[in-house]
């Protein structure tokens, strides 16, 4: 899938690099071309035969453009792990072959044996995709999970060229953690896909709570904040023609995404609630407790405000 600006990524890397080498394996051949500061240094060269496909891009950032050309292993590690979660079954290997700097105090004498240099390497591959992602996120939290299994589902509409993958699990904590992506880009400002998810989530949980008499007739509906308290969720949508707001691509604007996500989440979550009544009751009970705490806090604030007004007028 594309991030929305077709071909621009490699063009920009090429323009900002002192040198870039491209090796492409396709049509049974290996093709090579090199560039310097975005300008080809030769024509495309046809190489040996091959029965595999794939592309190798090697580039050297231009030190005249960037303040630093040092790559952060941890930054790359975090992004590649995220990409592996978002692309079920994809294997990503990150290797750092740079010699690590040695402090003066650690310099060995000539007669001391030196260990053979071993590059740092991490491999990411998640066969369960977002289900593994949510389990990973919750494993780092101190709170326990409300239900054991991660709720996970996916749906694709080939005619609309749109696909959705969702994974979610409630914890006993109080923080909401809803993470959204569009074509594997982190849309931390949300957008239409997140709006569809939130709307469906609130509607389905309230309907279920009413049907199961977990909310009394006189009780107000649970708010979205009540329901999402302690929730860890990842929503990943892939579209043929993504529309992002601004060049930062942190907010999705496709109107069709809202309806698609809302419909799929409504159907799948309703099915999960009906198929897992014990877990469903625990999820609703947590939301009801959040609602009660919110209302109690509001009453306490109002009482404090009234007391302050009386003391002022007195």
Model-derived features: positions:
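GHKL-family ATPase ATP-binding module
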Residues: 1-3, 7, 11-15, 19-314
């Amino acid at each position: 899938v594309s991030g929305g600006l077709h071909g621009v990524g490699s063009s920009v890397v090429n323009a900002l690099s002192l040198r870039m080498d491209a090796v492409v394996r396709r049509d049974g051949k290996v093709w090579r071309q090199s560039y310097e500061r975005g300008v080809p240094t030769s024509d495309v060269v046809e190489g040996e035969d091959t029965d595999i496909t794939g592309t190798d891009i090697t580039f050297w950032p231009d030190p005249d453009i960037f303040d630093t050309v040092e790559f952060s292993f941890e930054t790359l590690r975090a992004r590649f792990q995220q990409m592996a979660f978002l692309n079920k079954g994809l294997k990503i290997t990150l290797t750092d072959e740079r010699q690590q700097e040695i402090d003066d105090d650690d310099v060995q004498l000539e007669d001391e044996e030196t260990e053979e240099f071993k590059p740092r390497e991490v491999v990411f591959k998640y066969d369960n995709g977002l289900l593994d992602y949510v389990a990973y996120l919750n494993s780092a939290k101190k709170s326990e999970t409300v239900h054991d299994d991660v709720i996970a589902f996916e749906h694709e509409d080939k005619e609309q060229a749109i696909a959705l993958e969702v994974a979610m699990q409630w914890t006993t904590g109080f923080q909401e953690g809803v993470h959204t992506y569009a074509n594997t880009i982190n849309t931390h400002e949300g957008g239409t896909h997140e709006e569809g998810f939130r709307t469906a989530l609130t509607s389905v949980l309230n309907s279920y709570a009413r049907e199961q008499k977990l909310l009394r007739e006189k009780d107000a509906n649970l708010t979205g904040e009540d329901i999402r308290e302690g929730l860890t969720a990842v929503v990943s949508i892939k579209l043929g023609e993504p529309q992002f707001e601004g060049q930062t691509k942190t907010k999705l604007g496709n109107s069709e995404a809202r309806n698609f996500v809302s419909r799929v989440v409504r159907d799948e979550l309703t099915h999960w609630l009906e198929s897992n009544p014990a877990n469903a009751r625990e999820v609703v009970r947590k939301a009801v407790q959040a609602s009660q705490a919110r209302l109690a806090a509001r009453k306490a604030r109002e009482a404090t405000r009234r007391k302050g007004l009386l003391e002022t007028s007195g």
